[in-house]
C-alpha cells in the first residue's frame, strides 16, 4: 500500500473556532473546540508535566513517556464516563506510539484493552523525491465495533493517513467495522484537516461510524509551510511546530511567556522518537539550532522573529489578541 496525502487546504472557518472549558480535574484543564462545524470532536488538554515536557527540551528518555501519563489518564476517565470508549483496541504506529501511555492509562481507568496491533511505515523515494509511504511491518487484530486508540505525533499526517487506510481496508475485508477512533497527539492543524476528510470517506462505507475523538496536548500547533524556513532560516517545513495559526492552551501560553527561551525553540516538541531513544541526536539537534541562531544573530530581524513565534503582529489590542488566540469564549480570569 503506497499513499501520499497531497491536499493542504486551509480549514474552513478556522477563524470562527473557539475553545470552551470542558472540565478541570486533578490538575488537568480540558478545552473543547466549537464553532467549526466539525464532523469530529477535538479537545486540548493542559497539565503541569506536559507543559514541562514542551517547555524543556532537556526532558528526555522515559520522562517523555511519564510526562503524558496524568493528562492521558484523566482524559481516558472522561471519555469512559461519556461512553466514548467501551471495548478498546490499541493501534501502535511504530515508533511514535511508544511515547504515549495508552495501555497504562486504560489500566488505571479500568478500561479493558482487548488487543494491541502494531504497524510501521517508511517513506518511498524515487530519484531523491518522496513519492509516498509503504507499510513495512504489520500485526493487526480485529475487534469488531470497538474503539481504536492511537497515540502519534501529527505533523504532515501522511504516516497516520497511510496506516489508518490500511487498517480500515483490513477491517472491511474481515467483514468488521470500527465504532470510533480516539487519537492522542502532540500535533498540528493539519491533523484536523486530515481527520475531517477521513471521516467523510469512512462514512461512505460505514455510515454509523461515530468519527474521531482527538485529544491534543497543550495546543493545536502549526507546521512551517513548504518552502518556509522561518525568520531564522533554520526551521524545517512540515516538521517543526510553532504557535502561529494554531490554538494554544492558556496555561501553556502563560508558562511559556513567563520563561526566557521556550518560545524561541526550533520546535515545540522536536523529534519525539529521538528525544526518547536517541537522546544524543536530540541534544545535538537542540544545540545545532541555538548555535545557528547565534551565528545569524546580527542578521535576524528580532521584531519579525518575535511576531512569528507569538503568532500575531505587534502591537496588538487586547480584543484582537483574544480573537487571534481563539479565547473569546473563555472567562477573562483564565
Describe each region flagged by the PLM.
Residues 1-334:
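PRPP-associated nucleotide enzymes
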Amino acid at each position: 500500500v503506497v499513499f501520499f496525502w497531497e491536499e493542504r487546504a486551509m480549514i474552513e472557518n478556522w477563524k470562527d473556532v473557539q475553545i470552551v472549558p470542558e472540565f478541570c480535574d486533578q490538575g488537568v484543564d480540558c478545552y473543547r473546540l466549537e464553532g467549526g462545524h466539525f464532523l469530529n470532536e477535538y479537545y486540548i488538554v493542559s497539565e503541569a508535566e506536559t507543559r514541562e515536557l514542551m517547555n524543556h527540551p532537556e526532558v528526555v528518555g522515559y520522562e517523555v513517556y511519564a510526562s503524558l501519563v496524568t493528562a492521558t489518564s484523566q482524559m481516558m476517565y472522561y471519555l469512559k464516563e461519556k461512553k466514548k470508549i467501551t471495548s478498546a483496541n490499541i493501534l501502535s504506529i511504530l515508533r511514535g506510539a511508544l511515547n504515549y501511555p495508552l495501555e497504562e492509562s486504560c489500566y488505571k481507568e479500568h478500561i479493558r484493552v482487548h488487543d494491541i496491533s502494531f504497524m510501521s511505515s517508511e517513506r518511498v523515494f524515487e530519484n531523491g523525491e518522496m513519492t509516498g509511504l509503504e507499510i513495512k511491518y504489520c500485526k493487526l487484530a480485529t475487534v469488531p465495533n470497538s474503539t481504536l486508540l492511537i497515540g502519534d505525533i501529527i505533523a504532515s499526517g501522511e504516516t497516520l493517513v497511510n496506516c489508518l487506510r490500511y487498517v480500515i481496508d483490513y477491517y472491511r475485508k474481515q467483514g468488521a467495522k470500527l465504532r470510533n477512533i480516539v487519537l492522542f497527539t502532540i500535533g498540528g492543524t493539519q491533523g484536523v484537516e486530515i481527520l475531517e476528510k477521513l471521516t467523510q470517506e469512512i462514512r461512505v462505507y460505514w455510515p454509523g461510524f461515530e468519527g474521531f475523538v482527538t485529544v491534543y496536548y497543550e495546543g493545536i500547533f502549526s507546521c512551517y509551510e513548504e518552502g518556509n524556513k522561518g525568520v531564522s532560516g533554520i526551521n524545517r517545513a512540515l516538521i517543526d511546530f510553532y504557535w502561529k495559526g494554531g490554538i494554544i492552551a492558556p496555561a501553556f501560553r502563560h508558562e511559556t511567556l513567563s520563561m526566557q527561551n521556550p518560545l524561541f525553540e526550533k520546535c515545540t516538541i522536536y523529534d519525539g522518537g529521538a528525544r526518547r531513544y536517541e537522546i544524543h541526536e536530540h541534544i545535538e539537534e537542540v544545540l545545532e539550532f541555538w548555535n545557528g541562531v547565534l551565528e545569524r544573530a546580527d542578521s535576524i530581524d528580532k521584531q519579525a522573529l518575535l511576531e512569528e513565534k507569538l503568532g500575531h503582529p505587534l502591537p496588538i489590542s487586547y480584543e484582537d489578541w483574544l480573537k487571534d488566540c481563539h479565547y473569546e469564549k473563555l472567562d477573562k480570569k483564565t
